[in-house]
Curated annotation (Swiss-Prot):
GO molecular-function term, one example from the UniProt record: transferase activity
Organism: Reclinomonas americana
Protein name, as recorded: Large ribosomal subunit protein uL2m
Entries under SUPFAM superfamilies matching the protein: Nucleic acid-binding proteins, Translation proteins SH3-like domain
Keyword Mitochondrion: yes
Keyword Mitochondrion found: yes
Main location: mitochondrion
Length: 277
């Protein structure tokens, strides 16, 4: 996709960078594949705020995505590419030879009229889904199953992909994930070939606070601007620095310090992601 930049004729256009979505479908989604969404605005069942900075925004409909891709050896044709407000990558509407429709995550370079299929012995082509044991080493993949048959759970955001590194004789394949982590997966887990679409999503600049509100994001208040009852950094006479290392409202260290329990162990993780400097 192409990035759109604007002349600064208004303050909100200065620095605005958007994705050109002119090639995507401009109509409504397939009605049978959508359902209305009830916004929680960050509240739980008792009405208390459990997730801050949520609320408002445009109404959206959830699109049912086929993460399992379990219809083996049934080819489908890409009818159109669509925008999905609930995720960063684009989605593709697939029509099979029995006139059944489904949505899948659209890989980069997938075009209208292309054919996609799920199977064991099929071509290594963008959009096709295979077990890891049948995918060549070095291939870039996405929508990977953690447990066979449960549907793709990881590597599903815009521009992301994992790389198949090796295969062993114990029924596992090693993948390098987008975070830099090396992890083992069962070799019969399904994965889809290619890098996900909307690669330039990371270069978007929203331009103004109002656009954040359209997306359902509310303002973030600094802890030092609160009262002591609301935040560990709150209170004090006049402006203060907080007086302690940065923490969350629940006193967990922030600013990059690991908070995961050292006692937790996962034998499938070969090497954890390295710290970013």
């Amino acid at each position: 996709m192409i990035l759109k930049k604007y002349k600064p004729t208004t303050p909100s256009l200065r620095g605005l960078v958007q994705i050109d979505r002119s090639l995507l479908w401009k109509g409504d989604p397939v009605k049978k594949l959508t359902v209305g969404m009830i916004e929680s605005a960050g509240r739980n069942n008792t009405g208390r705020i459990t997730v801050y900075h949520r609320g408002g925004g445009h109404k959206t409909k959830y699109r049912y995505i086929d993460f399992k891709r379990s219809n083996y050896n049934i080819p489908g044709i890409v009818e159109r590419l669509e925008y999905d407000p609930n995720r960063t990558c684009f989605i593709a509407l697939i029509k099979d030879n029995e006139n059944n429709f489904s949505y899948i995550l659209a890989p980069h370079d997938l075009k209208v009229g292309d054919t996609v299929i799920t199977g064991n012995d099929i071509d290594i082509r963008i959009g096709n889904t295979l077990p890891l044991r049948n995918i060549p080493i070095g291939t870039m993949i996405h929508n990977i199953e953690l447990n066979p048959g449960k549907g793709g759970k990881i590597v599903r955001s815009a521009g992301s992909s994992a790389q198949l590194i090796s295969k062993d004789e114990n029924g596992f394949c090693m993948l390098k994930l987008p975070s830099g982590e090396y992890r083992l997966f069962p070799n019969n887990s399904l994965a889809t070939i290619g890098i996900l679409s909307n690669i330039d999503n990371k270069n978007i600049k929203i331009g103004k606070a109002g656009r954040s509100r359209w997306m359902g994001r509310r303002p973030i208040v600094r802890g030092v601007a609160m009262n002591p009852v609301d935040h560990p950094h709150g209170g004090g006479e006049g402006k203060t620095s907080g007086g302690r290392p940065s923490v969350t409202p629940w006193s967990w260290p922030t600013k990059g310090q690991p908070t995961r329990s050292k006692r937790k162990y996962n034998k499938l993780i070969v090497q954890r992601a390295k710290k970013k400097i």
